[in-house]
């Protein structure tokens, strides 16, 4: 027996023992597992906490391994050929399992090449935690990109979070560490324990490519169920490209999933949200919902705009399958789903991407490029292939795996300009000495080109607040390739105008009309978003001046203007019924206000104007074509009146829109129109059903033969105070 013990002891190098025991050894596969010797093989295992270990050979023979000089070390001789399993005696019982170190490299060289080039569009099928079967053994393959780490181990509830138990293999050419762990399946919680390039231990990291995450404040990743979701939206997907074409109506209900409706202070899960939200959105006439970011994020107060889990729907509202069911049910009711997506920056939480492998891996090393002082976040290094590939794969994950119909890309301006929110000397110029971020421009172009290629019919929308040229121009023509861009200029100008006392509006008339100067420079969405009802800005209703009747009338007129102005529509939740207070993510919307006829009237107006917008092609078919709009009255600053014609394709009836932004009734206000006969008043924001005074034109107005505003006929109109009316010609 003493000879055997001596032989076993000689199998362990003292330096190796120390490195294993201190969780510092960077090449576990060189030590652990079965290795050939002159007489057969030697099997080494390191299982801290184990009391005994045996190797069970394929023929049933059991070989007891001898304990080594450090607790948890076991070794023994095996025949030169044949497989084996480990039988491990723990204090609480016995475990029979395959040896993780008996398996060869897992990821193919092609996968590793695609990862290194930033071209792996199904990145979460390679990296992250994937339940697989290897050589007849079921388990989970873990893989993480950490090229500068000196050691990486996977830790989890399957190994008591012990970093000594499952050190990983480095695939040197790619910087990817991998390990197949037998018997680990869906639901297992895990993280990665890394040491930096100089051997220092880093905080345990969540998996950047995890498809499921632990509910906050927990920060672990979870092995996702590999069972594919069974979709039932073939009809929607087959017609999506047509539904989301440039000439189709798009009216978006922007919402925060956690605060749309709270029942007894509890968030709805995805199924509960689908039960309540989808019928509401359909009844209100919106064509799409836009969800504020649903990727996993540690701080709820960020509303999702500081995410760390870019491949995992947040656990706050249920499982990934729950999110898929929500999207599926939206599609079955004809509602598209857009999600906000954040490829600009990420938070500094220790368990996240910050200094992931002990170096600035996902972020820029220079804080003049890599730190965003406005948000105290780190900025992605879009010039690094693996990082841009990681982000593009995240976009593809939601567009392809979850059938999402579009992404609204957050904070595009902050990415495009190197001097964004920085003073002189606080930013690094590009190679030509300029402020444009060439790496981000290349990233966005590639992202949008790939989305068009691989997810036809999906739309990409930019939240871009500057005059950067060509945001929605084709990549082939030098543009960024987005489908649509938020029209922040329209939003700022018109909200400022609407917030003025009507007596002063005559001096700011240009704020109402200037948007048409550049309306066709891009393809626009008109956004009244969450950003306009937070941070002390007040609510949309609260911005309106005057007493109660004026505020509600102003709001109704403004919404009438918005829904008839060229551009797709976006309205944040609560604005559709005139929420009087700022949005608070910790509280549900004040739905009880619908007991008040004034708020119910605003809601009814939004429902009707949505249907009007969809019903009349003139209001949407030529949003991007100057032929679809013509001023009739654009210069009546004294009366704060505007009138314009919206035109559709050949055969579509034009629509006349007239808005009076003063509280003065205008009697006999004459508007030139292109044809005579009886024009029908199809919308009046002062209608009693909306909470107005029912001042209007009785539904019908006869055009008189009179040359006016370049037309041969004129309509004598009564313009309600702070009111918008819409008329259609005979026929």
UniProtKB/Swiss-Prot annotation:
EC numbers on record: 2.4.1.18
Functional pathway: Glycan biosynthesis; glycogen biosynthesis
Gene3D superfamilies assigned: Glycosidases (3.20.20.80), Golgi alpha-mannosidase II (2.60.40.1180), Immunoglobulins (2.60.40.10)
TM ranges: none
Gene expressing this chain: glgB2
Origin: domain of life: Bacteria
Its job: Catalyzes the formation of the alpha-1,6-glucosidic linkages in glycogen by scission of a 1,4-alpha-linked oligosaccharide from growing alpha-1,4-glucan chains and the subsequent attachment of the oligosaccharide to the alpha-1,6 position.
Family (UniProt): Belongs to the glycosyl hydrolase 13 family. GlgB subfamily.
A Pfam family it matches: Alpha-amylase_C
Any one GO MF annotation of this record: 1,4-alpha-glucan branching enzyme activity
Transferase as UniProt keyword: yes
Protein name: 1,4-alpha-glucan branching enzyme GlgB 2
Gene Ontology CC annotations of this record: cytosol
UniProt keyword annotations, A-Z: Carbohydrate metabolism, Glycogen biosynthesis, Glycogen metabolism, Glycosyltransferase, Transferase
Broadest EC class assigned to this enzyme: transferase
Keyword Transferase: yes
């Amino acid at each position: 027996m003493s000879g055997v013990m001596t032989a076993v002891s000689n199998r362990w190098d003292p330096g190796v023992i120390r490195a294993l025991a201190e969780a510092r050894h960077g090449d576990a596969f060189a030590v652990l597992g079965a290795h050939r010797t002159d007489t057969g093989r030697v099997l080494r295992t390191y299982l801290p906490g184990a009391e005994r270990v045996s190797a069970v050979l394929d023929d049933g023979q059991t070989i007891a391994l001898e304990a080594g000089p450090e607790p948890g070390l076991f070794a023994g001789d095996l025949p030169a050929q044949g497989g084996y399993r480990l039988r491990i005696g723990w204090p609480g019982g016995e475990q029979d399992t395959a040896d993780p170190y008996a398996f060869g490299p897992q990821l193919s060289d092609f996968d590793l090449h695609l990862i290194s080039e930033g071209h792996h569009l199904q990145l979460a099928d390679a990296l992250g935690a994937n339940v697989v079967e290897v050589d007849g053994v079921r388990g989970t393959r873990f893989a993480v990109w950490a090229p500068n780490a000196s050691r990486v181990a996977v830790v989890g509830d399957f190994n008591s979070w012990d970093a000594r138990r499952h050190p990983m293999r480095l695939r040197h050419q790619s910087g990817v560490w991998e390990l197949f762990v037998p018997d680990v399946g869906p639901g297992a919680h895990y993280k990665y324990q890394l040491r930096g390039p100089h051997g220092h231990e880093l905080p345990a990291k969540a998996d950047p490519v995890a498809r499921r995450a632990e509910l906050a404040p927990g920060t672990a990743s979870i092995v996702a169920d590999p069972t594919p979701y069974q979709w039932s939206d073939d009809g929607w997907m087959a017609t999506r490209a047509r539904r989301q074409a440039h000439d189709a109506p798009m009216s978006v209900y922007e919402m925060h999933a956690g605060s749309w409706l709270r029942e007894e202070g509890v968030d709805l899960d995805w199924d509960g949200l689908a039960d309540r939200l989808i019928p509401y959105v359909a009844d209100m006439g919106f064509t799409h919902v836009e969800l504020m970011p649903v990727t996993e994020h540690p701080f709820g107060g960020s509303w999702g705009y500081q995410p760390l889990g870019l491949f995992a729907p947040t656990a706050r509202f249920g499982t990934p399958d729950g999110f898929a069911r929500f999207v599926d049910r939206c599609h079955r009711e004809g509602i598209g789903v857009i999600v906000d997506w954040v490829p600009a920056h990420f938070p500094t939480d220790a368990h996240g991407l910050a200094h992931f492998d002990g170096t600035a891996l996902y972020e820029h090393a220079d804080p003049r490029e890599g730190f965003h002082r406005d948000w105290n976040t780190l900025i992605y290094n879009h010039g690094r292939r693996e990082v841009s590939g990681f982000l593009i794969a995240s976009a593809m994950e939601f567009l392809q795996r979850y059938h999402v119909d579009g992404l609204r890309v957050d904070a595009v301006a902050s990415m495009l300009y190197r001097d964004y929110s920085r003073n002189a000397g606080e930013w690094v110029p590009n190679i030509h000495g300029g402020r444009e971020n060439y790496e981000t421009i290349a990233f966005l172009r590639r992202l949008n080109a790939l989305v068009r290629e691989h997810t036809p019919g999906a739309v990409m929308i930019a939240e871009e607040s500057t005059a950067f040229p060509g945001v929605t121009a084709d990549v082939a023509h030098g543009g960024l390739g987005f489908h649509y861009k938020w029209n922040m200029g329209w939003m700022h100008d018109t909200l400022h105008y609407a917030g003025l006392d009507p007596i002063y509006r005559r001096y700011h008339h240009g704020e109402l009309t200037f948007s048409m100067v550049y309306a066709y420079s891009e393809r626009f969405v008109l956004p009244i978003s969450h950003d306009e009802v937070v941070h002390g800005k007040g609510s949309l209703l609260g911005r309106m001046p005057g007493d109660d009747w004026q505020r509600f009338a102003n709001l109704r007129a403004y919404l009438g203007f918005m829904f008839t102005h060229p551009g797709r529509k976006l309205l944040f939740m609560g604005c559709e019924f005139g929420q009087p207070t700022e949005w608070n993510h910790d509280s549900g919307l004040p739905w009880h206000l619908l007991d008040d006829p004034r708020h119910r009237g605003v809601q009814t107006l939004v429902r009707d104007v949505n249907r009007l917008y969809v019903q009349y092609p003139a209001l949407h078919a030529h949003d991007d074509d100057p032929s679809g709009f013509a001023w009739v009255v654009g210069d009546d600053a004294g009366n704060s009146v505007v009138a314009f014609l919206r035109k559709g394709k050949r055969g579509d009836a034009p629509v006349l829109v007239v808005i009076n932004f003063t509280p003065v009734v205008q009697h006999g206000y004459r508007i030139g129109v292109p044809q005579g006969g009886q024009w029908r008043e199809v919308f009046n924001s002062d209608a009693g059903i909306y909470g107005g005074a029912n001042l209007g034109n009785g539904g019908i107005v006869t055009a008189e033969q009179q040359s006016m505003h370049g037309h041969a006929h004129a309509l004598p109109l009564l313009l309600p105070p702070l009111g918008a009316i819409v008329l259609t010609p005979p026929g």
